[in-house]
Structures are given as C-alpha cells and as structure tokens.
C-alpha cells in the first residue's frame, strides 16, 4: 500500500502527540479513565440492521423493517438501545432496525439490510461498541492488528488466526502472553507495541483492515482518529468487560464473515448461560445468594470490569443490590456486608502464569504481607462456612468465562442440576488451546478454600491456615 508522504507526516505527528498523552495517563493511573456500565439491551448481535434483535441478520430482519414501513408493526415497539454518538457524549435512542443509524427507519435501511443479508462487500456496517458508542466498519473485515488476551481468544475461536498481521507487545517481543498464542506468532506478525500507545507507523506500508481493540479506558482512546487516514477500522467490543462474550463473538463473527464459528461458540456458552437463566428467573433478586467477588477481597469493583457481571451471570446477588458502591472495603466492611459467598479472581492459570505452586503461595504471601485474600475476610461468616471460591483469569473474564460462571453457580445453588465443569474446561482447551490439556488448569482455575488448605498443608512446610475469627 503506497501512501502520500503528506498523509504519512500527518499520521506520524498525530501519533507522537497522542502517545505523549497516553504515556502520561499510563504513568499516572494505569488507564485512561473509569469504564461505565454498558447501556446495551438484551440484544447480543449489536449491529444496526439486526432489526428484530435476535442472533442473526437474515430475511426476518428484512421483513421486520418492511412491516414497519408498511405500518404493520409499530416502530415504538421495535428493539432499541441508548447509544452515544461520541465517547462520553449524550445518549440518544437508536432502533436496531435503523441500519444506517441516521435516526429514522425507511427504505434506505431496508435496502441496506438486504445488502447485509446478501453479504455485499463494501457495505458500511454500524455497530454498538464496548463504550456504548455508535461505531462503523466496512464489510467484510479481513486482516487485523490485535491487542490483549481476550481479543486473541476471540480471533482464535473464530478460526481467524491466519489474518493476523500485527500483535501487541504482550504477545509479540516475547511478551507475557506469548506462550498462549503461538499460532498467532506463526503468522510472523509485526509487533506494534503497547495497546495504550501503539506504534502506528508500522502500519503505514501495509495497513490492516481493522484493529481489534477494547474500551477506551484500557486502550488508546484516540485510535480511530489516528488510523482513519490509513483506511483502517477500529472494532471495540466487550471481550472481557461484561464477562460473558457471546454477543461480541457473534458480532465480530458477522463482521468477518465467520458466522458459523461464532454460532458454534455461542452454543457452547449458551449451554451454561441459558440453563442458569432459566433456573434463576424464578427467583427474586432479593432471594438470591449474595456474592462478594473481587481480585483479593479488599475492594468492590465497578461495573463493566467483568467482576459484578460474573455474579449476575451465575445467578447471584451483587453488593450493588445491597446499596454498596465501588471502592475499597476492609474486613469489618466485609463482615457487615455478610455475603453468602466470596469469590477471588487470580492472575494465574489458563492465559496467565501456569504454575500452581506460585499461585497458591502468592495467595499465602499476599495474605501475610498485605492482609489480602483469606486474611482480608477472616472474620466473615462465608469464610467460617468455607464458602470461598477462587477462579483463574482464563475462566473468570472473557470467552472462557462461562466455565467460571458454571463453577460459581454449582456452589451457590447446590440443589440445582450441576454442570460438569471439568468437561466444559476440557472442551474449551481442546478446541481453542490444543497445545495444552485441561488437567493442566482445573486446580488452578477452579478451586475452593477447602482444597486450597488441603494442598498447602500437604505441600508447604510450616503452612498455617488463616484462623477463622467470625463471631455470630
């Protein structure tokens, strides 16, 4: 791809300016801001033109819009969503039947949906992104640059590894995630550096069709403007922010013309999510188990960080349901909350450091030195009753999250039909990480306080269980 030297100069100047801002933000806070809770409806395929709000763009959507135009259906009753025209702007309503997202549903939308059903190349697709922003791309998406582990997972699930041309420094440059994504490295991709401050100059001679990105709080927020002169689209979908990722896989699958792989993944995840939803739909929120989930028992996470969402998906009640807000919480606060269950999220196991000894000792050491994990919740009734679960990142957030959700559901609803979590993990690993075995991860990604104590007592000389200090 040849570019006008003036355009190259403009792009480079913009990159330098944006990089300076991003470096400041990373040094100051580690991110670009606080993520907000998604305003999406129950629609999972978040592409405008999915008029009836199901998981497909097909002839049913054509008929739906035709019925609106003919007055047979009321537009007011059609599926809709609150969307931002620009990041951190003002919300406005858009109907999913509004394929070109111009604020009205008419013949133009009908024609566009027909093109979308027929998969006409060059069709401009409008979609709802991770930050509730109205975004667009050109169909079909092909070659790409990708950053962060859950995004690599998504491309692997879709069978789209061969189109990878650029990787971030967490996989490239022998980064910490390289061991999990060797098939991507086999494509000889170029490393573009950090997802916060990408080196966009590496794209200029062979620009990718799109960049698979994420929330502007944790990826360069100015990415769209910077790569626009290259003709590269930016796709920001929630591959970890909402824990479950079925909708994001379906959406990206359509955009890349890889619908079959997306639907196959959806069937796996829905085999868990639908059964849980059916079971808990009969239970009022106030009657569901209260679950306090977090990284190490010392804070209540914001929405849109994948933690509260896991509780909801597993059928639990969150601290927010009890009037709590995000922020730090000490042992006394946990005791006052009195959760039925407590869940920790570890940066170990599948897609992280694959070392059970390090993981278990990390919990122990952090408890003693920083009053985290079991030390932080020692006075809680949940700890007294051994109702503490630990999940690894690979099954806690992202495409593998339905496994962790099943594990939590099994425990908080022990009388419900139980999921075979080991089989779910085996299927996931064999399909998407065939270089590994599920037995490598079960004791790292899904374990509880009882099994943890048993292992530590048998393997760590001088191990002392954190005393239970709960008093009724």
Over which residues does each language-model region extend?
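Cellulosome-associated attachment modules in secreted, modular CAZymes
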Residues: 20-125
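Secretory targeting signatures
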Residues: 1-32
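Alpha-helical, coiled-coil/dimerization segments enriched in small aliphatic residues
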Residues: 172, 305-326
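Sec-exported extracytoplasmic/periplasmic mature domains
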Residues: 67-74, 115-119, 149, 156-160, ...
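A short, structured surface patch at a secondary-structure boundary
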Residues: 142-206, 210-217
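Extracytoplasmic ligand-binding site segments that recognize negatively charged/polar headgroups
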Residues: 145, 170-177, 217-222, 237-251, ...
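Structured C-terminal subdomain patch of bacterial secreted/periplasmic proteins
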Residues: 221, 241-256, 263, 351-471
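Bacterial Sec-exported substrate-binding components of ABC uptake systems
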Residues: 37-41, 102, 114-156, 260-292, ...
